[in-house]
Amino acid sequence: MGQAKYWHPYQMRSARLILVEDDAFTRATLGDALILQGFDVKARVATAAEALAAQAEHAPQVAVLDLDLGIGPTGIDVAIALRNKNPQIGIVFLTTYKDPRLIESNLPTLPEGAIYLNKLEMTSTSAIAGQVSSAMMKPLVRRSFPWVRNSPLSALSTLQIEIMKEIAEGASTSEIARSRGVSEQAIDKSISRISKHLGLPKSADSHQRVQIVRAFFENKGQGI
């Protein structure tokens, strides 16, 4: 593990930063907010290729990334690539997803020292700025993640997350069972366990599936 560099408070708030966010409105408003907080926002980009080009041009000290960048590499993939170029770059994820497995079940592990923030839980840009400063001051410190600490999703296995996602995409029990080469009874048991872990009330199968779909989108930050 590399030695953390000491940053003077003034240096922290004038740090070179790149913002990786595929939503144009969020990219513009968050970038402006971080500038007002004193950061030197060198680039606001939407894709992995643009992020790596911005790193090569500006040598940022910290990167703020969305998790879901649309089709192609995720924010985690981008963060890993940034770290490969600069092992000391601070990494902050700012996303609506309460658990990254809701994007893909086989995502790589978050880079060591990364800070994971939920957009819907942040109350001010100064709170975001404080976390960005922390990521830059101690880029490799071991951190716990929110879905591990206090989310009902933490009790779900990767397989259960996958089944939850398939239900949300409209797959029937028989379709899920067929695609996985198991019995419908096995999938029914998995659905019951998912409901129990999420704290959903017992109900008829159709209503149970509706509740799982609602929980899936709520945990993505896209409530229905």
State what each model feature region is.
Residues 145-192:
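Helix-turn-helix DNA-binding segment
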